Curated annotation (Swiss-Prot):
Family: Belongs to the peptidase M1 family.
Gene Ontology CC terms, in alphabetical order: cytoplasmic vesicle membrane; endomembrane system; membrane; perinuclear region of cytoplasm; plasma membrane
Domain of life of the source: Eukaryota
Enzyme class: hydrolase
Gene name tied to this protein: Lnpep
Annotated source species: Mus musculus
UniProt keywords, alphabetically: Acetylation, Aminopeptidase, Cell membrane, Glycoprotein, Hydrolase, Membrane, Metal-binding, Metalloprotease, Phosphoprotein, Protease, Signal-anchor, Transmembrane, Transmembrane helix, Zinc
Keyword flag Protein transport: no
PANTHER family for the chain: LEUCYL-CYSTINYL AMINOPEPTIDASE, PROTEASE M1 ZINC METALLOPROTEASE
Catalysed reactions listed for this entry: Release of an N-terminal amino acid, Cys-|-Xaa-, in which the half-cystine residue is involved in a disulfide loop, notably in oxytocin or vasopressin. Hydrolysis rates on a range of aminoacyl arylamides exceed that for the cystinyl derivative, however
Modified residues (Phosphoserine): S80, S91
Intervals of motif Dileucine internalization motif: 53-54, 76-77
MF annotations from Gene Ontology: aminopeptidase activity; metallopeptidase activity; zinc ion binding
Transmembrane portions of the chain: 110-131
Protein name: Leucyl-cystinyl aminopeptidase
Length: 1025
């Protein structure tokens, strides 16, 4: 699945960071002055969102700390008998000692009862504490829950629920689902029935599976030896979204059974599960559409199922629809037959064996363009008025599909492959087997309005989702702790395949950019290993972050570079062949590599140092004669030096590559493995400089001794092209990151980028703009306007020649066009080089033509932003927004509207997107991030997030990538203790699950680091800048 943001880079899908220490780029933050007076208890009762006291349904009564813990335990276990009312406490007051009375002696009966109660209570406590503890692995707890023998959760009907764990038991597995659905897109409800063929792997009496939000009307059970259906009762345990069927007979190992469940449910109004969409077509007619998004845990909301990735099965799906609608699912349509009331029922062929999260179905009005590719019918679908924008996607898909089949030496196994542009979709895209779903802006391409960046976005996301047909669909991780096996591989293949097939797009620049941003996130204490233990739904949702995607991909790039492309490819082919249609763990991947390397290198041992611990190494390099002295430690952004964790536990096996001035760069590269704290590399000759981590293929930062930094800086000034553009960008990134850590003077970082006046490549310039923009944003948001202006003037002086050479056209290579876009946006944002005048002239001509005059696509967003600075321009852009047929153009308009200096307009934009009527709610994250990037809105976004937190969580789900992005984007530019206290207080007032979210902890850490950066650098920066 592709998380989505359509910013400059893609951290799960294009994110641009604007804070000093936040990886999710485009986000924004805004906050009002915090409340200076603590709330009285009476005031808490009237909080708009409600406090945790009121959530527990206690009304005006408060509860002390022990009682709140007790109530939490009751909720956790689902035990109604543990609930206590305040009335019990009040009645107890009568037994308290009166101040002026004597203590009456209790009766013998009373003493016996009291002693008995105490003995029972102590016994229960001892049993609970003496029970064997479960040892959790990263896959979760596999020990039998012995405490369940004494304390069991309670189902909704008051009976004991026979299973207490979040993970399903493995005694029963599904073999095949027959699913029939009849959605009503007007009432937004649906009826369904699912028949599940089961097999018992162990003797049991209970069938435990997932179900949530279903009104179950009938459940029947049948064994393989009997054709008689038996109606059975179900138990529901909503807290774990589970149901239990108690079979009428023992289920015996190796025997097959059939379970049929009939139910009804609402079509979701969120972006999760089987959800509904309404939109207005060109004729202003309201249209209805329904689609699915099941990853990670939402298949259970559409039909009862074993909703864990390891429970693979086949699926036969039937959908009843209106005659004017089209229904699609994973497999080709097998038949269409008339149903009741003039409806039609489509039946789809039985699927291959797959996980529940990959099941998909869509109902709505669509048109398609198709082409056969070696027996597979490839089709791209869109709503009727946008069918003209699917040609690029179809051509791209055909080329990539052929490439993957050749590279993996495994044919795509299905007879059809559909790609569908969904009118309203939260994720960037989803890899459902045979039915890929996309946002319209990530699949559709309009030649007249789509920029080169839009083309790259569409191409890369198609490449990503197609790669999933092998990595994730054919071979699937057993549990969400190893999500990186899906997403890391798909992300790596996304860049690798585009570089192979569409070399002119220079996708390596985007991959480099993404690695830089991911490492910023991974350098925080709130980071996590890419293979991490997860259990709760919030923990699983949070695994869909830039680390699973881009760190996973970066580690694979590093491994490929170290082993060679041929060895890497052979290991991947072996891995796919050995585990087709299976569910695997990380060790299965590394075993395939070890088999190919013939154990000359223990790849498993090497790579576990990268996947099972968070963070990455800082490699310190010192050159002494012909020796390179190397040392490794964790690169850790910390609030104070003493807060850094002990370094003794951090050790990576690091592929060390380097280049020097002693050999021809294009022909010489040396690689060795640093698998201990320090080591020495012997050079073959005396050299003037050495650059470690050649082409930045390694996932680490390099720090040089002062003289070696100086030698590299001097070489860049003499002739930067001795080093590749990747290496030049890498040096810029590393020195600014080290300056942020205090290991290098900030002035030395600016000395290094002085060479930029001679730079012509995109990657180094965009990285320098990014790093200096981080500093500018902090200075501006704190009101240091003179200092921020001096910073802009210095950067402008370095890039003045390049800016003056730009034309307002779409001419040049894709890389040149992206550089033009970045330079002109920088110039216009700061009113440099007559940029505003040129953009205003273009905008006025476009507005005079009522939007019919074409604009250069690569500078379109810059022109729109300048135009939106006036009241007339803003209103005209807004009037054009709804009528635009291109999502690429609509996004450019939206970004311009959200860049206004009018806070009333900004608030209205965010509110309109949240409501979803004029601007779709899927755009809200983009709007919030854009609002917060600019000075007038940087406090407004945080206020909006606070005021609408409950609505946001309902729409996007706690822990989801969108929530991560919104939290980061509305806080990551704060750099005062006042804002730190406000953000912390707000989240402490939410649920415990919210406070524990990794994105919340990360937001607090980022604010602290911003504060630290300003304390460390502001004075010296003002002295020499």
């Amino acid at each position: 699945m592709e998380s989505f943001t359509n910013d400059r880079l893609q951290l799960p899908r294009n994110m641009i960071e604007n804070s000093m220490f936040e990886e999710e780029p485009d986000v924004v933050d805004l906050a009002k002055e915090p409340c200076l007076h603590p709330l009285e208890p009476d005031e808490v009762e009237y909080e708009p969102r409600g406090s945790r006291l009121l959530v527990r349904g206690l009304g005006e009564h408060e509860m002390d700390e022990d009682e709140e813990d007790y109530e939490s335990s009751a909720k956790l276990l689902g035990m109604s008998f543990m609930n206590r009312s305040s009335g019990l406490r009040n009645s107890a007051a009568g037994y308290r000692q009166s101040p002026d009375g004597t203590c009456s002696l209790p009766s013998a009966r009373t003493l016996v009862i009291c002693v008995f109660v105490i003995v029972v209570a102590v016994s229960v406590i001892m049993v609970i504490y003496l029970l064997p503890r479960c040892t959790f692995t990263k896959e979760g707890c596999h020990k039998t829950n012995q405490s369940a023998e004494l304390i069991q959760p309670v189902a909704t009907n008051g009976k004991v629920f026979p299973w207490a764990q979040i993970r399903l038991p493995t005694a029963i597995i599904p073999l095949c689902y027959e699913l029939s659905l009849h959605p009503n897109l007007t009432s937004m409800t649906f009826r369904g029935s699912v028949t599940i063929s089961l097999q018992a792997l162990q003797d049991t009496r209970d069938i435990i599976l997932h179900s949530t939000g279903h009104n179950i009307s009938r459940v029947t059970f049948m064994s393989a030896v009997s054709s008689q259906e038996k109606q059975v009762e179900i138990l529901e345990y909503p807290y774990h979204e589970q149901i239990a069927v108690v079979a009428p007979e023992p289920l015996l190992t190796g025997h097959n059974y059939t379970l049929k469940i009939e139910y009804s449910a609402n079509i979701s109004n969120s972006y999760y599960g089987f959800y509904g969409i309404t939109y207005t077509d060109k004729s202003n007619e309201k249209k209805y559409f329904a689609a699915t998004q099941f990853e990670p845990l939402a298949a259970r909301s559409a039909f009862p199922c074993f909703d864990e990735p390891a429970f693979k099965a086949t699926f036969i799906i039937k959908i009843t629809r209106n005659e004017h609608h089209t229904a699609l699912s994973n497999m080709p349509k097998k038949s269409s037959v008339p149903a009741e009331e003039g409806l039609i029922q489509d039946e789809f062929s039985e699927s291959v064996k797959m996980s529940t999260y990959l099941v998909a179905f869509i109902v709505g009005e669509m048109r398609n363009l198709s082409q056969d590719v070696n027996g597979t019918l490839v089709s791209v679908y869109a709503v009727p008025e946008k069918i003209g924008q699917v040609h690029h996607a179809l051509d791209t898909t055909i080329k990539l599909l052929e490439f993957y089949q050749t590279y993996f030496e495994i044919q795509y196994p299905l007879k059809k492959l559909d790609l569908v542009a969904i009118p309203d979709f939260e994720a960037g895209a989803m890899e459902n087997w045979g039915l890929l779903t996309f946002r319209e802006e990530t699949l559709l391409y309009d030649n007249a309005t789509s920029s080169v960046a839009d083309r790259k976005l569409v191409t890369k996301i198609i490449a990503h989702e197609l790669a999933h047909q092998w990595f994730g669909n054919l071979v699937t991780m057993q549990w969400w702790n190893d999500l990186w096996l899906n997403e890391g591989f798909a992300t790596f293949m996304e860049y690798f395949s585009v570089e192979k097939i569409f070399k002119e797009l220079n996708s390596y620049e985007d991959f480099l950019d993404a690695r830089f941003k991911t490492m910023r996130k991974d350098s925080l204490n709130s980071s996590h290993p890419i293979s991490s233990s997860v259990q709760s739904s919030e923990q699983i949702e949070e695994m869909f972050d830039s680390l699973s995607y881009f760190k996973g991909a970066s580690l694979l790039l590093m491994l490929k570079s170290y082993l060679s492309e041929d060895v890497f490819r052979h290991a991947v082919i072996l891995y796919l062949h050995n585990h087709s249609y299976a569910a695997i763990q990380s060790d299965d991947l590394w075993d395939s590599f070890n088999e190919v390397t013939d154990k000359t290198l223990d790849v498993k041992k090497m790579m576990k140092t990268w996947t099972l611990q968070k963070g990455f190494p800082l490699v310190t390099v010192q050159r002494k004669g012909t020796e390179l002295l190397l040392q490794q430690e964790r690169f850790f952004l910390r609030m104070q030096p003493e807060s850094q964790p002990s370094d003794t536990s951090h050790l990576w096996h690091i592929p060390i590559s380097y280049v020097t001035d002693g050999r021809n760069y294009s022909e010489y590269r040396s690689v060795s493995l640093l698998d201990k704290k320090s080591d020495v590399i012997n050079l073959t000759e005396q050299v003037q400089w050495v650059k470690v981590n050649s082409n930045m293929t390694g996932y680490y930062i390099v720090h040089y001794a002062h003289d070696d930094w100086t030698a590299l800086i001097n070489q860049l000034k003499r002739n930067p092209y001795v080093l590749s553009d990747k290496d030049r960008a890498n040096l810029i990134n590393n020195i600014f990151e080290l300056a942020g850590l205090g290991k290098v003077p900030l002035r030395m970082a600016f000395d290094l980028i002085d060479y930029l006046k001679n730079e012509t490549h995109t990657a180094p310039i965009t990285e320098a703009l990014f790093q200096t923009n981080l500093i500018y944003n902090l200075l501006e948001k704190l009101g240091h306007m003179d200092l921020s202006s001096r910073l802009v003037a210095r950067v402008h002086k370095l890039l003045q020649n390049q800016i003056q050479q730009q034309t307002w056209t779409d001419e040049g290579t894709p890389s040149m066009r992206e550089l033009r876009s970045a330079l002109l946006e920088f110039a216009c944002a700061h009113s440099l080089e007559n940029c505003t005048t040129m953009a205003t002239n273009l905008f006025d001509s476009w507005m005079a033509s009522n939007g019919t005059q074409s604009l250069p696509t690569d500078v379109m967003v810059t022109v729109f932003k300048v135009g939106a600075r006036t009241e007339k321009g803003w209103l005209f852009l807004f009037s054009m927004y709804s009528s635009m047929g291109s999502e690429a153009e609509k996004n450019k308009i939206l970004e311009a509207l959200a860049s206004s200096e009018d806070v009333h307009k900004l608030y209205w934009l965010m509110k309109s997107s949240l409501d979803g009527d004029i601007i779709r709610t899927q755009k809200l994250s983009l709007i919030i991030r854009t609002v917060g990037r600019h000075f007038p809105g940087h406090l407004l976004a945080w206020d909006f997030v606070k005021e609408n937190w409950n609505k946001l969580v309902h729409k996007f789900h706690l822990g989801s990538y969108t929530i991560q992005s919104i939290v980061a984007g509305s806080t990551h530019l704060f750099s005062t203790k006042t804002h730190l206290s406000e953000v912390q207080a707000f989240f402490e007032n939410q649920s415990e699950a919210t406070l524990k979210l990794r994105c919340v902890q990360e937001a607090l850490e980022v604010i602290q680091l911003n504060i630290q950066w300003m304390v460390r650098n502001l004075k010296t920066l003002s002295q020499w800048l």
